[in-house]
């Protein structure tokens, strides 16, 4: 990737700013035009622009914003538009910086589902995020940065059940804390759960063993 020119990288890598207002072009008068702006710069045909923009605004559920002025949106609305303006470019790699910082819980869930959809389409997504329970549910791998260096790089289940994360001020998922506490009490867990469904499975497995698992005296 380092050998690629900036022009090529700009087509292969999409970046969503933490502050969505910084991503607004400032020259378009409707959300629809704002989302289409990048495609226009690449010389994409008019028919393809309409097709791709229509698909993306449906995906992000922002049809009702299509005719609004980009500078008159709320923070959450602007965040969705910023995400749409990048996804419409169909980059191979998405870098998304705190995409839910201005969203309510419902909006947060919607955005993570969109990110999951991109992942299922084969898009590499690098997500900068502090909502640990969302990371547990949607991420494949976790990289912990400390003072500009990589402090930990591991699959999500391994990373989010590692107590060393707390040394860096990272709170483990509640489900992981439960699993670690049970294991410390001597319960034989086949894995440390990091999500609610996993925790339910672990507790159900213990119940099948009589409620005590293989706890040691």
Model-derived regions, located:
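Catalytic Walker B motif of ABC-type/P-loop ATPase nucleotide-binding domains
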Residues: 94-97
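Conserved ABC ATPase "signature" region
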Residues: 36, 40, 47-64
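ABC ATPase nucleotide-binding domains
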Residues: 161, 165-217
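Conserved ABC ATPase "signature" C-loop
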Residues: 147-148
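H-loop/switch region of ABC-family ATPase nucleotide-binding domains
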Residues: 129-130
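Conserved catalytic motifs of ABC-family nucleotide-binding domains
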Residues: 90
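Conserved ABC ATPase signature
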Residues: 69-73, 77
